Amino acid sequence: MKKILSIIAAAALITTAATAQVSSEVAEKVYKIMESTDNNLAYHGDYSATISLVVEKPGKPKENLQFKIFERTDAKLMTLVQLFPEADKGKGYLRNDENIWSYDPISRKFTHTSIKEALGDSDIKLDDVEQDDTLWRDNYEVFAYEEGNLGKFPVDIITLKAKTKEPSYAKSKFYIRKDIPLVLKEEDFSGSDRLMRTILIPKYSKVPAGYVGTQIILRDELNKGEQTQQVISDLTFDALPDKIFTKAYLEGLN
């Protein structure tokens, strides 16, 4: 009987840990920290940039991909156009609110797709390059909060649990600088708490509009040795014409 009670108690502790949540005061503090990370970034309103990816997989040569992104962050509008390799030039993605399409310039057809779709053979998904000001409160609940250090930086360590189908992962842990709220590291987990992916942001650049993570490393934790390095360049924050966020724009590129 004592053994059975011990097993029941252990199971109860595991269940409690799996469903643990913070107080409403801590949750509000966490949401404000996450929103501060967005506010510190340069992506507000319209912007465009070049995204260069280097995909590394054991036993294979490095693969280079390049995209041009146009986004209107306050209206959930995004257009992404592949620039390289030449064989895939003109492929693209279009987002208008909750509708997301991929575009094939050879067939000239649009296909409904998901924000969770990967870019080429990389570890980067569409929602990694999109900037969404309503992401945190709408799609996550606060699971845990603590303070710690990451290298030389004091950080807030925040674990968020997905409450909608929008996030690509069931749970994500963020390591955020205390002095300037910027994400330095992110760990993404499955529903069974298996580490799926690690994101490192070792380099930020300061521009007049805010900070830009100009170097990002995404590691596939299921396939050791696989990673994608992302470099952001050619940033502009000028107002974009509405036609860029249309199917006709993608069709007209080829």
Question: Model regions: which residues?
Answer:
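Flexible, processing/modification-adjacent segments and terminal tails
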Residues: 21-36, 42-45, 61, 97-170, ...
